Amino acid sequence: MDRSMEPLTPSRLNTLGERPTNEVYEYGKGKNVQHLFPITPMQRPLGKENAAPGTISPIAVRSRNVRAVEIADENACEEPVLKIKSVSSTESEEEKESSTEIGEKQEKETHLEPKTPVQTNTNNNHLDDIQCCAKNLRLRLELAMYKVQVNQTFSPLQDLPIVAKTKLHNCPNSEPVTSIWNQRSLSSGKPPSLHLSGNRRLSMGSPTKSIYDQNGLTTPRPIGSDDLTHMYDPYTSPLRTPSRTLSRSSSHYLWVRHGKLTRSVSLLQHKTPRRIRPKSLSKSNSTPLKHLSAQKPNSNYYTGPPTPVSISNTPENIHPSSSEVRRIASHSKQFSDYGLIR
């Protein structure tokens, strides 16, 4: 496809709006390729590894190509000397002396610094960057692991991952963590007493895995309960314990609401369904209240319908302070008349 026929998308355009040349998009061949690559943490100066992108100027970033840095340094050192020599013919004698001194100083500096240590210094800096970044990452990882270790036993159980939950449930020589939900009060001096609701007897296998009695809530433990499918231990976790004890009959799953016609497992051979009601509804232990006839009150208390009173004539509203006192007295117990009489 011809290049002129390609659509001009913004990603293919320069900052000036022109189409860039091919050499910019070839890796490492263009002249201004360096600014296209993202600044990696290895290129950042020491102490700025975690700085936000864009906050560090590209001048502070070391170039990747060590040889290019050497060539640039040589050019920078040679250019002022050449300029001074070309201009020195038109200058006065004093300026000549000063310029030659400057040139000699720069030449001495360039002769004193050999070319090979530049490469070793940049390599050492690069290694220092790598070591510093690795140390920083190691410290962060250690801090994260420490936080996990510290918070694991004290954090609420639903915030922990699944594997941690199973490990905490089956942890030897410690009471199950889930029972902290059943505790009544926190004592200030000693750690909270953990206890389980229901009748509990310890199994012979491990000291902490508890099994409820047959008259309790749950059935015997299935084999292979360490799988993630049995994540919540039904013997220690209150998440699996039902709110009420299940009935002994085999038909407790088939029961519907009160008074509905249900067919029990034990009654399946009967063709006609029976109405099943709990005992609490079949027997009424409470006696109904006696019907009180609407009697008129005694003449002592009943003086007729209430007489309307205008608000402006009432003595409470004459002084605003007295009305405020009455309002307070009517709303609070400590200022009420009943308290004064008592």
From Swiss-Prot:
The GO annotation for biological process reads:
negative regulation of transcription by RNA polymerase II; regulation of transcription by RNA polymerase II
Region (Disordered) residue ranges read 1-22, 83-126, 183-228, 266-330
Compositional bias ranges of the Polar residues kind = 205-218, 309-323
Stretches of Basic and acidic residues bias are at 97-114
A Gene Ontology molecular-function term?
transcription corepressor activity
Question: Which InterPro entries does this chain map to?
Answer: TF_Nrm1/Whi5 (IPR013734)
Biased composition, class Basic residues, residue ranges: 271-280
Q: What is its main location?
A: cytoplasm
Reply yes or no: does the keyword Repressor apply: yes
Q: Where in the cell is it found?
A: Cytoplasm; Nucleus
Keyword annotations for this protein, in alphabetical order, are: Cytoplasm, Nucleus, Repressor, Transcription, Transcription regulation
Checking Pfam families in the record gives: Whi5
Q: Kindly state one GO CC term assigned in the UniProt record.
A: MBF transcription complex
Provide the family line: Belongs to the WHI5/NRM1 family.
Protein task:
Negative regulatory component of the MBF complex involved in cell-cycle-dependent transcription.
What interactions and quaternary structure are annotated? Answer: Component of the MBF transcription factor complex.
The molecule here is called Transcription factor nrm1
- Its gene? nrm1
